[in-house]
Amino acid sequence: LETGNKPFLHKIIEDNPKILKKRLSVLIKRFDMIIFSGGASEGDEDHIKSVIEEMSGIIHFWRLAIKPGRPMGFASINRVPVFCLPGNPVAAQVCFRLLVEAGIRKRVSADKTDLFKIQVISKFEQKCKIGRKEFLRGKLYYEDGITYAQINGEPGAGVLTSLSGANGLIEIDEDIEIIKKGDIINFIPFKEALI
């Protein structure tokens, strides 16, 4: 909305490849960008990837080395971008903020597609898995003129309450094994936190 785009919320599409292909064929002609929520994984009822391939779409990536958000896809059909978000609510929100918002900005204007990040001081300790980037829901606060970040809520891609009260994402690079209190870390504030 803030970019001047007009979103259209489609009803839930049945987990049926024929129905999905029929609906996607119509949507591709009508809209400048398609965003799916769920169906991007590799279960028996996840058909989006195979339908896109069947429609001669180009799969740009499918699955990411991030947490949450591993089952995230990006494709295009007839030059229309198709984002396929994970089904878990927190993973979907994280991927939307990291990838889809950048895609929308790029479609509207090639300027400023990079994420806005600030460096803050960690007020927590966290073990991390090497080899994947991790995004924790976080909360900024100020103490004695210093900006700190704390983990907000419980971890997990399905724990929606971790977004409640969070005002950004704590970014942990794939080569970090542990975050200690006092470490300098990257924080990606939600836009509304900057207002």
Regions found by a protein language model. Give the residues of each.
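Loop/helix-junction capping segments adjacent to catalytic residues or to phosphate/diphosphate-binding pockets
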Residues: 17-18, 42, 93
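Flexible glycine/proline-rich
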Residues: 51-195
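Short, ordered loop/turn segments at secondary-structure junctions
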Residues: 12-15, 39-40, 64-71
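Glycine-rich beta-strand-to-loop/alpha-helix junction loops that act as flexible
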Residues: 34-48
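Active-site-adjacent beta-strand anchor residues
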Residues: 10-13, 38, 85, 172
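Short loop or secondary-structure boundary microenvironments that flank
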Residues: 14-17, 38, 89, 153
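Phosphate-binding glycine-rich loops and their immediate beta-loop-alpha structural context
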Residues: 1-36
